[in-house]
């Protein structure tokens, strides 16, 4: 029974994953750099998606024209209910096919040939529903971007004349075949469910008998289980507007997925990697509704191709690094902005700035190169020497010292500033460490939570070795007066250049001010000198005048003898 098979596959997958987890081992190490308030988690191995593998999955359907049975037996009623669900599901898929972008006009014209099912709703309602689905589908496509481009391309080809019949013919005597499509692409096609033969040859002959009786309940249960897969596939496509991710076990059971992986044109190491991590593979895969035609439902499954595996990967964690002046509002902050996942890739480094897009299983990192940037290997120098001349390390600046914590693989970075209380606690012993102002690090050994103000952080319990690399916080090297604030996408050289510009401006201002002051001093000296000279001259003139005056006053008047005799005195001359 298929439900039991699904459960068995799920259990097998879990056991395989657990076995792989223990077999792979944990060699994770972590280094915290006090100088830059950052930590690097090492010891991971890569699994980078570099391409897509597309396969066509088919389900053969039955064209149920009528149900003659009108019996009242409980088992017959259950069968009739399942048949109604089946017909409604097929109708839903027909409507969905009309509203998806890959459908062309020819396929739409040929749609009525397939089955005679119609919804009980009016035609106007169907048109409205179709328009809503189309808008939703287009919105979803904008969300996934170009990720499903290859799958959509294959889906479009299936709408061409004769493509479905070509696939149907190839799967007549087998459940798996390679089919060459009209665009020259060969795809692996698989028939995962044959409802047509089951309904036409086993079920309908029973329920359409004159007696309308079913001898055992197993027939009902078997049809419910087979029908359930179609109903779930229909529901997923309907809810997700024709494109679903991850790929569920209804789209592909675990055994079908493992079989498909085994048929992929990849190395044995790649097959082993995918087989041991089927849940991650499902999360990074897509199923795309294609066509329902010629009594066949066809949809495309798009699986990731991991072209780069087993290269070293590491994750960079960063937190704000600020000065710790007691005066509020006088601090400056610097934060590294190059946090994310890094993996070696063909002599360079693939950088994934959005770390959450990568999936981690044990020490394996699954990332999509579509979300990556290619950087030189010198990027590693930023961890040990942020001022290195070979690579310009990325930072951001601010003057807001906000306290926070960043949970790393093996501990936590704590940025504690101002009057915020920051502590690390053990669930049994309580607070085991109180952080002082600044940036600090604590490993997860013997520690369960970190508290920053009113925010509580739970640390990871991954095992590994932590190393604390001490160093002078680089923020202390900068002068708050010339430190540029609110640089959100800058580098060390750009910040230093702005600081140098500020210093040059200050020096120029000082020179101008000095020159102005020097000019003023010279003028003042000249004026003072002139005034002093004038005063000296005036004083000299006054002194000479006084001297002459005094000299004149001190000289006696002497009369001659004639003047004294009066003979020649003018007063007596007449």
UniProtKB/Swiss-Prot annotation:
One cellular component (GO) term of this entry: virion membrane
Effect ascribed to mutating residue 447 to V: In strain: Cold-passage attenuated
Similarity remark: Belongs to the paramyxoviruses fusion glycoprotein family.
Chain segments annotated as coiled-coil in the UniProt record: 76-96, 158-209, 481-516
Gene3D superfamilies: 1.10.287.2480, 6.10.250.1160, 6.20.370.50
Side Cytoplasmic, residues: 551-574
Protein name: Fusion glycoprotein F0
Annotated stretches, region: Fusion peptide: 137-157
Gene Ontology process terms (BP): entry receptor-mediated virion attachment to host cell; fusion of virus membrane with host plasma membrane; symbiont entry into host cell; symbiont-mediated induction of syncytium formation
Sequence ranges on the Extracellular membrane side: 26-524
Consequence of changing residue 416 to S: Impairs translation or folding of the F protein
Name of encoding gene: F
Keyword Glycoprotein: yes
SUPFAM superfamilies associated with the record: Virus ectodomain
One Pfam family here: Fusion_gly
Annotated S-S bridges: 37-439, 69-212, 313-343, 322-333, 358-367, 382-393, 416-422
Example GO molecular function: identical protein binding
Result, substituting residue 322 to S: Impairs translation or folding of the F protein
Site (Cleavage): 109-110, 136-137
Key words, A-Z: Cleavage on pair of basic residues, Coiled coil, Disulfide bond, Fusion of virus membrane with host cell membrane, Fusion of virus membrane with host membrane, Glycoprotein, Host cell membrane, Host Golgi apparatus, Host membrane, Host-virus interaction, Lipoprotein, Membrane, Palmitate, Signal, Syncytium formation induced by viral infection, Transmembrane, Transmembrane helix, Viral attachment to host cell, Viral attachment to host entry receptor, Viral envelope protein, Viral penetration into host cytoplasm, Virion, Virus entry into host cell
Residues the record marks as carrying a glycan: 27, 70, 116, 120, 126, 500
Segments crossing the lipid bilayer: 525-550
Effect in UniProt of substituting residue 108 to N: Complete loss of cleavage between F2 and p27
């Amino acid at each position: 029974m298929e439900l039991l098979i699904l459960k068995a596959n799920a259990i097998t997958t879990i056991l395989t994953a657990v076995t792989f987890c223990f077999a792979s081992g944990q060699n994770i190490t972590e280094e915290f750099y006090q100088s830059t308030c950052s930590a690097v988690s090492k010891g991971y191995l890569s699994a980078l998606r570099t391409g897509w593998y597309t396969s066509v999955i088919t389900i053969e359907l039955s064209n149920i024209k009528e149900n003659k049975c009108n019996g009242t037996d409980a088992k017959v009623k259950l069968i009739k209910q399942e048949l109604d669900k089946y017909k409604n599901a097929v109708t839903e898929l027909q409507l969905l096919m009309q509203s998806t972008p890959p459908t062309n006009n020819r396929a739409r014209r040929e749609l009525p040939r397939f089955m005679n099912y119609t919804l009980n709703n009016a035609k106007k309602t169907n048109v409205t529903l179709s328009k809503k689905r189309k808008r939703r589908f287009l919105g979803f496509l904008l969300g996934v971007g170009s990720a499903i481009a290859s799958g959509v391309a294959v889906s479009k080809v299936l709408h061409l004349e004769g493509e479905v019949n070509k696939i149907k013919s190839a799967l007549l005597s087998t459940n798996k075949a390679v089919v060459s499509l009209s665009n020259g692409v060969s795809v692996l096609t698989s028939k995962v469910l044959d409802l047509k033969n089951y309904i036409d040859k086993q079920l309908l002959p029973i329920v359409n008998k004159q007696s309308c009786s079913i001898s055992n309940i197993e027939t009902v249960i078997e049809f419910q289980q087979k029908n359930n897969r179609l109903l779930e596939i229909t529901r997923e496509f309907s809810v997700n507007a024709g494109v679903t991710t991850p790929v569920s076990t209804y789209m592909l059971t675990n055994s079908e997925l493992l079989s498909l992986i085994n048929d992929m044109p990849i190395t044995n190491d790649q097959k082993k990697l995918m087989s041991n991590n089927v849940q991650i593979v499902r999360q990074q895969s897509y199923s795309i509704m294609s066509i329902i035609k010629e009594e066949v439902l066809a949809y495309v499954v798009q699986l990731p191709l991991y072209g780069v595996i087993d290269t070293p990967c590491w994750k960079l964690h960063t937190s704000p690094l600020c000065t710790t002046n007691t005066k509020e509002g006088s601090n400056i902050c610097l934060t590294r902005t190059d946090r994310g996942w890094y993996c070696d890739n063909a002599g360079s480094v693939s950088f994934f700035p959005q770390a959450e897009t990568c999936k981690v299983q044990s020490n394996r990192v699954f990332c999509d190169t579509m979300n990556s940037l290619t950087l030189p290997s010198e990027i590693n120098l930023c961890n040990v020497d942020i001022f290195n001349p070979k690579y310009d390390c990325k930072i951001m600046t601010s003057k807001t010292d906000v306290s926070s914590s960043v949970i790393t693989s093996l501990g936590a970075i704590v940025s504690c500033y101002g009057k915020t209380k920051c502590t690390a606690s053990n669930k049994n012993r309580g607070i085991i460490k109180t952080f002082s102002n600044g940036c600090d690090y604590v490993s997860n050994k013997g520690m369960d939570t970190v508290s920053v103000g009113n925010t509580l952080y739970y640390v990871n319990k991954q095992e590994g070795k932590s190393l604390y690399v001490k160093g002078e916080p680089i923020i202390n090297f900068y002068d708050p007066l010339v430190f540029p604030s609110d640089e959100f996408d800058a580098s060390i050289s750009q910040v230093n250049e702005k600081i140098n510009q500020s210093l040059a401006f200050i020096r120029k201002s000082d020179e101008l001010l000095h020159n102005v002051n020097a000019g003023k001093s010279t003028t003042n000296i000249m004026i003072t000198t002139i005034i002093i000279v004038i005063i000296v001259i005036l004083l000299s003139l006054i002194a000479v005048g006084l001297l002459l005056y005094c000299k004149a006053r001190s000289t006696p008047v002497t009369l001659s003898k004639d003047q004294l005799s009066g003979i020649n005195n003018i007063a007596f001359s007449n």
